[in-house]
Amino acid sequence: PYTSERAKDKVKELAKIVGRYTEKITLYVVPFTEIQMDIIEKCREDELTIIMRRFMMRVACELSERKKIQSITTGESIGQVASQTMEGLMVSNDVSDRPVFRPLIAMDKEDIMDIARDIDTYETSILPYEDCCTIFVPKHPKTKPRVKDMIIAERKLDIEALVNKAIDEMETFI
């Protein structure tokens, strides 16, 4: 309910464009609102983003397991947003059971925008539709999270049930 159909259409269009450069692309759209609402209700505001990112990694790992995919690739770049610090990436990685590739990791925003223009994703990517990462942004996100603190914070959440329900309710687009 928090992410519009237009936002979903934007992601589908981006996948279609990126698909021109790959053999085959399958888009999995995972409903994240219930996870976010549970995190917001039970965790500290400054930890929302990193706990949400840990859930995204868990969902990606579980989906990878079910689909027999050996690795995860993300679009993260050091320092581009508060959660993409070295500490934030390490805390996110902590829940992954497979390699995580980050081809944009050392690029700055201008480099990434140049690539987006080159592959024709830029104009679509800047469309102003809110997504799950922009709606629930804390005022002061934690930039130096620690694994042990996140493990303690996450004890309040039913991680396995939330991850499984999200994957069970996902939509698949080919």
Q: Predicted segment positions?
A:
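ATP-dependent adenylation/nucleotidyltransferase module used to activate substrates
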Residues: 1-118
